[in-house]
Amino acid sequence: MLCSLSLVLCGLLAGTRADPGGLLRLGMDIMNHEVQSAMEESHILEKMAAEASNPQPGGKAIKGLSNMKVKDVLEPVITLNFVPGVGISQCVSTGMTITGKSFTGGNMEINVVLNITATDRLLQDEEAGTPVFRSEGCEVILVSVKTNLPNNKAINKFVDSTLRKVLPGLMCPAIDAVLEYVNKKWAKLTDPMPVDKMGTVKYALTSPPATTASHIQVDFSPVVQLQEGQLIQLATDGSLPEFPEGSAKDSQLLLSATFLTAELALLQKSLEVKLKDKRVGKLPQNTRTLAGFIPQVAKTYHKPKPLLIKVKINKPPKVTMKAGKSLMHLHGSLEMFAARRHGKHPKSLFRLETHIGLEIHYSVQDNRLQMVTSMDSLLSLARESSSVGDFHEAELTGFITDYLQKAYIPVVNDVLHVGLPLPDLLAINYNLAELDIVEDALVLGLKTE
């Protein structure tokens, strides 16, 4: 008994698209789940039936009907279809029993099955910048009517008149109420969300949502801001990221590598550390171990001195992505010191310019994007200064790589543990998402269960 009518969530087609940092596709799976959830969680049909059964003082009475009650509301059946350039057609089928005393003086009982139609538009709220649904109309179509009253012309006219007066006022406000319930699930979308205490991320819309034959698409131009107020601009070079081919009907969130790069810029200062009292395997971190790679160190330090290492990150971390693999690039310097007694400042042995490549492993926990890194490679190592004479940096590659893996990577992962916020909309459970690394982007396949 499903109908062809439509609750329309109209997405305005975007014009010239700016370079988005994120793309969201809402397929029929998510939309079905959200509309059904709004109907169930709001209990709106039951509430409307209760209100109809308890009219307010001063309410307009229906001629020929008294003591009206509405009961036995059937669970609604909802079917959705996308309408390109318009929105979503929705069919809501339900039924109920209307009782009362008719003009004949007897008890009346009408069992009715109906479809509700409405046209609603998905707009972008000018003030908040969030999507918002607005209803433009509503109709109630009768599918079947059964009554305990005699079957004659006068009774049939009375039943028809009663239903035409009761049903629109009962069902159409219910549809509006469901839309309001859904609107609340968009309300926090553009609120700034913290990244530890370093800054915030705000998912601003690039343009109003667009509707195709298979999905609604929302383009994001995220605003990344340091705690002090400085905005971090997303890089505009490179091609626009795209969803994988053949996934047009799936609900997906795409986060570009440039957006993730901007977010990690919030954490740059936290990645600069001083390390000491560390071991690489069985090797103690002292000048005697270092002398095995740079013999000149043994001439200066006859007795072993503890080593201190300072890691400085000179550029914001950069994220790159190829199919199946993502790297975090850290450009900076690594300076090694020998500790000295009696409160003296450590002695700088050398400073190396470094380019570190860390492989990123993604997951979602508590609806935040989590990153865990592991050492991929030491992409470059160049001597900037040295107090222990000349040496070949290449001879230190293995030692430095092992040290970074054992001592520095845990620090990086501890910093990343804060997680990166994901768009807060429609109560989407990102913990269920399937993650896929594609060219220049991370794609989250969204699930409802």
Curated annotation (Swiss-Prot):
<keyword id="KW-0325">Glycoprotein</keyword>
<dbReference type="InterPro" id="IPR001124">
    <property type="entry name" value="Lipid-bd_serum_glycop_C"/>
</dbReference>
<dbReference type="InterPro" id="IPR017942">
    <property type="entry name" value="Lipid-bd_serum_glycop_N"/>
</dbReference>
<comment type="similarity">
    <text>Belongs to the BPI/LBP/Plunc superfamily. BPI/LBP family.</text>
</comment>
<dbReference type="Pfam" id="PF01273">
    <property type="entry name" value="LBP_BPI_CETP"/>
</dbReference>
<dbReference type="GO" id="GO:0008289">
    <property type="term" value="F:lipid binding"/>
</dbReference>
<keyword id="KW-1015">Disulfide bond</keyword>
<dbReference type="Pfam" id="PF02886">
    <property type="entry name" value="LBP_BPI_CETP_C"/>
</dbReference>
<dbReference type="InterPro" id="IPR017943">
    <property type="entry name" value="Bactericidal_perm-incr_a/b_dom"/>
</dbReference>
<protein>
    <recommendedName>
        <fullName>BPI fold-containing family B member 6</fullName>
    </recommendedName>
</protein>
<feature type="disulfide bond">
    <location>
        <begin position="138"/>
        <end position="172"/>
    </location>
</feature>
<keyword id="KW-0732">Signal</keyword>
<keyword id="KW-0964">Secreted</keyword>
<dbReference type="InterPro" id="IPR051660">
    <property type="entry name" value="BPI_fold-BPI/LBP"/>
</dbReference>
<feature type="glycosylation site" description="N-linked (GlcNAc...) asparagine">
    <location>
        <position position="115"/>
    </location>
</feature>
<dbReference type="GO" id="GO:0005576">
    <property type="term" value="C:extracellular region"/>
</dbReference>
<feature type="signal peptide">
    <location>
        <begin position="1"/>
        <end position="18"/>
    </location>
</feature>
